Amino acid sequence: MSEQFKDNFWGPNGFETIEKRMNQGTESTRLFLLFLKERAAIEENYSKSLQKLLKSTSQLIEYGTLRDAWYGVRGEAESLVRVHHELGQKIEKDIVAPFSKFKSEQKKVKKNFLYDAYKLNKERKDMESSITKTRAKYDDYSKQAETIAITMETAKNTKTAAEVGKIQSKLQKIQRDASSAEQDYRDSVNKLSMYQPTWEDKVSSNYHTLQLTEEERIDYIKVQLEKYVGAIKSTVPDTETTNRNLVNVITQIDKLEDIHCFVRESRTGTEKPPPPQFISFGGKSSSDYIQNKASYSAPLTSSVSSNSLTSSYNSATTTPTPAPRSTPINLSKKKQAKALYDYVGSDATELDFFAGDIITILDEDESGWFRGELGDRIGLYPSNYCEPI
């Protein structure tokens, strides 16, 4: 299994995990540099302190063997002054100065790469957020259309034509809003679907670049630690065993092993996010309620006379429940009906007409929904909106 950044951080918080490691690396570099700077300062200060001590005791006068011993003590201290001064200077000039420059330069480079990764991460999150919002809007309008369609179905049994017309107008508006919201939702899904391959390539490239900067950091610190051991070895006597152990552990620093260790312990997922899918409204579509108008119950049964129909609407009384639907009756002789009220169909299967229009009756149904012809249009219409002529 690959243990590269670009193959293991596709899961949730993948970018955040890499970002955290990059920031940890920056902080570690700062602390490595701080240690070396302080070690150099301590060595220099120790050298100066010894020098000051030697100066303050320079008036000590002895004779014979005690004088010889004193000279030996001073000589050892003077040797340490030189050793610690040289070690401090080597660490400061050969390690700290270039290390400080590397730290500043890599911090800027990583900041730019991390910002690129942040933008890519935010870009996708913004697109996903747009999909979530447009889907919620689409579902909301679709649900409203579904509810109003049910209301209109019931209203055709209980309400006046004018009241039904208002409900119908509201339904048509909500359906238009739902259609617009659906298109926005589809556009959001398509936008991310089309961009996804490009986005994946950019993310892979960016993560690989971030890994290279981490490898560079590990390699550079390894070199500086080797120089540090070399400085100690060349200036401090009697440290051969310590130096040998330190050299061995520093030599074993392996950038790839360290990268793989981080990946194994922190990976968020190897599967790239699937492309988004358009999900249709989960409820029953409003079109399910208006697709087959012959199955609707008309406000009044076809057996009610035109006078009763007119009286019923004028008094706004509750209408009786229609009889169950029966098999349509084919007319041997075409009949006509005159529209008593304006009617706007809820879709293309219904006839629109105005009061006074003459409709040729093609089929009658006991449910109250007739099929008729008006001009060059044929469709379903509620028979209780008309009177036979």
UniProtKB/Swiss-Prot annotation:
Domain F-BAR: 3-258
GO cellular-component term (any): cytoplasm
Organism per entry: Dictyostelium discoideum (Social amoeba)
Biased composition (Low complexity): 300-328
Single Gene Ontology MF annotation: microtubule binding
Keyword Coiled coil: yes
Spans annotated as Disordered: 300-329
InterPro entries referenced in this protein's UniProt entry, alphabetically: AH/BAR_dom_sf (IPR027267), F_BAR (IPR031160), FCH_dom (IPR001060), SH3-like_dom_sf (IPR036028), SH3_domain (IPR001452)
Gene3D superfamilies, alphabetized: Arfaptin homology (AH) domain/BAR domain, SH3 Domains
Location of the SH3 domain: 332-389
Pfam family, one: FCH
Disulfide bonds: none
Superkingdom per UniProt: Eukaryota
BP terms from Gene Ontology: actin filament polymerization; chemotaxis to cAMP; vesicle organization
Name of this protein: SH3 and F-BAR domain-containing protein DDB_G0274695
Keywords assigned: Coiled coil, SH3 domain
Coiled coil: 119-192
